Amino acid sequence: MKQTGTAHALGLIRIDNELVVGGPYAIEPSAIGSIIGALALEDGAVTDVGPDASARHLRIFTESNVWYAQDLGSANGTYLVEASNGKKLDISSGVPAQLHPGDTLRLGLSTTFAVVAT
């Protein structure tokens, strides 16, 4: 189904042991996207990550009003847990994966973000 209109902003909330420890971090709709990583310097970057996250670990962006998450060649991988079915996807290959509010992103072993609508 083709979506119309403009994608709404997403938020990332950092979770550790089921407790909120950071955020919310607003991610604005953009084809360039926002970078998440230990040394991400771009506008809108999120650097609230654990010690095993790469410098530029993940990109979140929109294309045709659909949100995507893309691993940027991280050393310790990225996993997406889909809220709709609980399926855990390894997205470390760099192929963009569709992202929805309610999903969870795990960067390496120490960083987990809940994806929320804003």
Task: Annotate each language-model stretch with its function.
Residues A38, T62, D71-L72, E82, ...:
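Residue-level recognition of conserved beta-strand positions in structured domain cores
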